[in-house]
Amino acid sequence: MNDQSMTIRGKDRYKSGVMAYKKMGYWEPDYVPKDTDVIALFRVTPQDGVDPIEAAAAVAGESSTATWTVVWTDRLTAAEKYRAKCYRVDPVPNSPGQYFAYIAYDLDLFEPGSISNLTASIIGNVFGFKPLKGLRLEDMRLPVAYVKTFQGPATGIVVERERLDKFGRPLLGATVKPKLGLSGRNYGRVVYEALKGGLDFTKDDENINSQPFMHWRERFLYCMEAVNRAQAASGEVKGTYLNVTAATMEDMYERAEFAKELGSCIVMIDLVIGYTAIQSMAKWARKNDMILHLHRAGHSTYTRQKNHGVSFRVIAKWMRLAGVDHIHAGTVVGKLEGDPNTTRGYYDICREEFNPTKLEHGIFFDQNWASLNKMMPVASGGIHAGQMHQLLDLLGEDVVLQFGGGTIGHPMGIQAGAIANRVALEAMILARNEGRDYVAEGPEILAKAAATCTPLKSALEVWKDVTFNYESTDAPDFVPTAIAAV
C-alpha cells in the first residue's frame, strides 16, 4: 500500500491538538526492523471509511506511546526510538476490508522476562479502539535478546521422556470423566484402572479444583495411591496431572507442595489463572523438578474468531516463554476447533528449536528459540483408537494423546479402554518402524490388531463412524501455489 512516510517533523510535530497517527511517526514504510525489535502482525479491520494506513498507525500508536492528542511531554523522551512503527500494510487475501499490519517495537519498551508486561502493551488497550471493527494479533517475532530473559519450559520433552523412560512413541493419557461429581475414592479408581490398562498419564479436567463433593487433598491422596499401585502392577512409570489451580497463589503453592510430597512427578494449572501466576508456577516447577501441564481453559474466547482476538499460535509462543512443559494444542480430527495446517503450526512452535517462516502453517516470521526447552503438545477432545494412524501422521510422536471419553466410555470398562488405546498405538508404531504406509493401511493394521485384542475390537465397533467434520474458523490465509514443471 502507500509507501510514503507522512510523518510531520520539527516543532509542528508537537503542536497542541489532534493529529493523525500516520503523521505522528507511527507509519514508517521505509523502516527496516532491527534484529532486536519485537514484531507483531495484526489483522486490522477498519470501520467503513477509515483509511487502512491510519488504522494500522493507530494500532502502533495506541500499543506503544500515543494517546488521542499530542502531548508536549513526548519531547522529554527518546520519542523517535520508543514509538512503535508500522512499516507494512497488506490486504488479507480473500478477505475484503481486512489488512495485515506489521508493527515493530523497540526492545526497551518491554520489561525483561514478563509476559504480563508484554501483553499489557501489545493487547492491553488497543483492542477496544473505536475506529476498528476488529483487531486480531496473528503472530509475533520475538528477538533472541528478549527470549533469553525467560526461563522457558521447566522440564522439556527430552528430560520428561528420560524421567518416564518412554521413547519412540506418543505418550497416552486420559482425562477423568465425568469431570465433576465423583467422590475421591471413585475418582482414584478411574485413575488406577486407566493407568493399569496401559496409559502413561491421567489428568484432572480444567474445572476440578476443590468442591464440596471432593476436596483437593482427598483427590490428591486417592490419585497418588492409584498411581503407585498402577506402577507396581505394570512396572512402568506413571503419572496423573493434579490440578493445583486455586483462588490465590498461596493456595496453589500449598497444593503443589502437597503433590510433590506425595511423590507426583507432574502438576497442572489452567490458562485462566493469568500470565503472572503461570510464570510463578513455572519457576516453582523448575525449582522443585516437576513437570508443569497447562490446560488452555478459556482460550477460545479470544483465539477462535478470525477477525478479533489473539491467535493461539501467539498464546503458544507466550507459554513457551512462560515455562510450561505441556500445552493443549489441538487434535485436527477431534471435537474441538483445529484446521490441519494451522494446528501443525501450533505444534511447530511447541517442538522446534527454530521456526522458519511457513505461511501455509500460519507462521509469518522466523523464530529462534535460543535454546529454550521444547513444550510437549497435548491432543485432547473427541479422539479414539480408530483414529490412531491419522493422529500419528498428523501430530508425530512427541505428543500426549489423551483419550478421555475414548477410554472411560469403553463398553467393557475403563481398563479395557486403556488397553484398546495402548494396543492400537503399539500396532501403529510397529507398522511405522517396519516401513509400512501406516496412514493408507491404518484401518487394516487396526483390524489385524483387533483380531487378538477384544477391547480394541469393541472400541473400533463402537466408534468406527464417529467423526467431527466441520469447517474450521481459523484456516491459514496463505497456501502454496502449485508451479507447473518446465
From Swiss-Prot:
Q: What else is known?
A: The basic functional RuBisCO is composed of a large chain homodimer in a 'head-to-tail' conformation. In form I RuBisCO this homodimer is arranged in a barrel-like tetramer with the small subunits forming a tetrameric 'cap' on each end of the 'barrel'.
**Needed co-factor(s):** Mg(2+)
Question: Which factors induce or repress this protein, as stated in its UniProt record?
Answer: Expressed under CO(2) and H(2) autotrophic, but not under heterotrophic growth conditions.
Sites where the protein binds Mg(2+): K203, D205, E206
Q: What is its EC number?
A: 4.1.1.39
What does the UniProt record say this protein does?
A: RuBisCO catalyzes two reactions: the carboxylation of D-ribulose 1,5-bisphosphate, the primary event in carbon dioxide fixation, as well as the oxidative fragmentation of the pentose substrate. Both reactions occur simultaneously and in competition at the same active site.
Q: What is the free-text note on the cofactor?
A: Binds 1 Mg(2+) ion per subunit.
Name the chain's protein: Ribulose bisphosphate carboxylase large chain
